[in-house]
Each structure stands twice: as structure tokens, then as C-alpha cells.
Amino acid sequence: MMEFDTIAAISTPMGEGAIAIVRLSGPKAVETADRVYRGANRLTDVPTHTIHYGKLVEQTTEQVVDEVMVSVMRAPKTFTREDVVELNCHGGIVAVNRVLELILEQPDVRLAEPGEFTKRAFLNGRIDLSQAEAVMDLIRAKTDRAMTVAVGQIEGRLSKLVQDLREQLLQTIASIEVNIDYPEYDAEEMTQQIVQKDAGEVRRILTELLATARQGKILREGLSTAIIGRPNVGKSSLLNTLVQEAKAIVTDIAGTTRDTIEEYVNVRGVPLKLIDTAGIRETEDIVERMGVEKSRQALNSADLILLVLNGNDALTEEDVLLFEAIRGMNAIIIVNKSDLTQAIDLTRVSELADGRPVVTTSLLEEAGVTDLEAAIASLFFEQGVEGQDMTYVSNARHIQLIKQASQMIEDALGAAEASMPIDMVQIDLRRAWDTLGEINGDTAQDSLLDKLFSQFCLGK
């Protein structure tokens, strides 16, 4: 275990609340807390993994700062594998900041840097780098499924797979090195067969893993989803129905939504960042025109388009132009207002949809919403999100490293097939082995670690 100084930080979100937590970690964590703690027993004398009621006081005046419950956890069975103390004080802004100030006034303790607790857990071997990154994914998860994927990664699901692949590559590399060191055995042809078989299997698994990248990124980052359509077809009603709150103004007046409105929503485990756009149409209103331009920008950057049509009207030229604007994009066509007399040509709608899902709804009565949710989930997850038990790769850094390693193995296989010198094959496999090691942090550089952990919040 590496030697560090003692750090402290607030580990709970700022703001009003019943309880806040100040966390300490390091060789003098218990000693530091004990200096300002007054209770039935000294913290330096209590057993590990116990919690104690007491008060925090100013050392010079013995004035009470706050009542606290103190958790004492001694190394190595802690998150950082160091001595850890958590001070559970009253929530709010003033109380918890005063407790932190009291701790930082003590000698040999400093304010933690962003992500430093997790960084210490990594450097002390408690978790690897992919598990550390999954901690932030868990904090930022917007759906149950995204949380499940993050927890699986924290528990080492991706880590173990990467370790197994690196071990398989290492065995292949070792076979090559035997051939290089003992050329008199003339086993080069056999070694090439081993490379084709073993390295080929690693490449196959990496290819399967990369196939989950699109779905993994959706679960991790969400789908940017633009709701588009002519004015007053029910776009804001759709947003409010999915969010279950009145976020957008719903009136009979065309052009009411004059800007884009964004909201996150969980649709059957798929996180959507819904963007309710202003109706796209030609207008003389300067403010509405600015909203229309933002709508066009949202349309171009969206992962998914929800095109809303008015079933009570015949298709208009504006509707057809919207179909043209989303040509080739992931889209679901929503024919709204099914509770009214239908004037729309559904056959023509299906032709314009060009194989993309068409769902009929009455958002006023919330009819057809279940069908819409199913269409969204099945568009990106053929077997449904909740039913899939698999290892996802969702982190952009991991995806890039896997792509690089896969290409290096491809180069090695090509070299072996072309009967190039076996040591040339070994170089590519060794590079792939090193590249995969960056996922777990086995071969990561310090500059990368500093960059990754700086993205964490204070106290984590």
C-alpha cells in the first residue's frame, strides 16, 4: 500500500438536508477526528467499523460546534485501504462547512482534491481504473439499467474480461518468444497456428464487446431525443406525458413553444434527453424564428427523432418537408390526436416513414403511450433493455482502446498469415496487450490518471 498524507472533504451534496458527511482518509484520520471529538470513548481506542455518538468542539474553548455520529473504519478494510473516519453532522451549508473547517484547522490534514478518495482506492489496489470510472457512472446513472451496468463494472465484470484477454495474449506472446529464443526447434509454423487460433479468439471477443458500445453509450450518456413537428400537433403534450410533469406550455395557439425545452426521462430503462423544439415553420416573428433555428440545430445533433403528426389533419407540405429533413435518421413517427376524427393518410405516412416505426396516440388521453415506449426501447435494444444480462462497454476511453487493440491483433494476424518474421507478429500482440492494460490501469500513465480523477466530485 502506498503512503499518503491525510485528506478531508464533504462527501454529500451541498444544500439543506437532515445529514451531511465529512470524510477523512489517511494515516492520521482517526487521530485528527479524536482531537475535536468528545464522547464516551476516545476514537483512538474504539474498535474498527463502529459508530459513536458525540460532539465536535473547538479545542481552545471547548465550545460545541455540532452533534455528530462518527464512523471509525481502520485499514485495510476500507474503500481507500487507509484509515477512514466519517463525521455525520447536521445538513445545510453552514454546519457542514464549519465541521470541515474545524478538521482542516488540525495539523497534517488537507482538503482532498476532486476524486482523490477514489484515486487512493485505485493506487492502493482496492479497485482498478475501469472500476474507478464506474463509480462516477454509478453516481451519474439516470436509469435502473444504467445503474446495474455501472454496479457490474464496479464489481469487476469488465475488469475480469480484460484480464482474461490479456492473459490469453500473454500466453501467445510467450509461445512466440520461445520460438525466437530457441530457433533450433524450428517451430515457427506451429507458432503461427497458435497465433491464428488464440489471437483470433481474442479478436473475436473484442469484436463482440465493441458491438455493445452503442447500447452501452446510450445507457451511460442517454439518447439526445428531439421532438419535432408542425406547431400545435402535440409536441409539448408528448414531453409532458413522458416526463409526467407540466414542463411545457400546452395551448391551442400555434407557436407557443418559442425555445427548446430539455428534460431527462427514463423510458423502459433507456435514458432520453428529451428536447421539445419550437414548431418548425416559416414565420415573421423574430423570437419564434430564433426558436425554429434552435430546433433545426437540435434536429441535426439528435440521436433519435420523435416526429409528431396531427391525425386530425391531412398531411401538409410542412409535414412532408420534415420527413425529408429526417431522411436516414433514427426516428419514430407519432400520429397524434387519435381521439378525434382521422383525416391523415396512414398509407402515405408509412411510405414516408420508410420502414421506421409508426405509432398512433392520443396524448390527451395518454392512449398509445405504452406502444411508443416499447418502440423506443426496441429500436435500440432488440431484446429489451431489462432482459439483457451482458457486459457492456460504454466509456469512450475504453471503446477507443478496444478498437486500437483489436486493430493491432488484426495486424498481427495479417502478418502471421503472410508468413512474416514471427518477431514482427509478437510486436503487434505486445502492443495490443499494453493497450488493453490501459483499461484497467495496469499500463496507464500518471498524466491520464490525473485527468480522469480530476473529473470526479470533491469527497469521492
Swiss-Prot record:
Its cofactor is K(+). K(+) binds at residues 232, 251, 253, 256. This is tRNA modification GTPase MnmE. The gene is mnmE. GO terms for molecular function: GTP binding; GTPase activity; metal ion binding. NCBIfam families: mnmE_trmE_thdF, PRK05291.1-3, small_GTP. It is found in: Cytoplasm. Exhibits a very high intrinsic GTPase hydrolysis rate. Involved in the addition of a carboxymethylaminomethyl (cmnm) group at the wobble position (U34) of certain tRNAs, forming tRNA-cmnm(5)s(2)U34. Homodimer. Heterotetramer of two MnmE and two MnmG subunits. Belongs to the TRAFAC class TrmE-Era-EngA-EngB-Septin-like GTPase superfamily. TrmE GTPase family. Keywords: Cytoplasm, GTP-binding, Hydrolase, Magnesium, Metal-binding, Nucleotide-binding, Potassium, tRNA processing. One of its GO terms (cellular component) is cytosol. It comes from the Bacteria. HAMAP family: GTPase_MnmE (MF_00379). GTP binds at residues 232-237, 251-257, 276-279. (6S)-5-formyl-5,6,7,8-tetrahydrofolate binds at residues 23, 86, 126, 460.
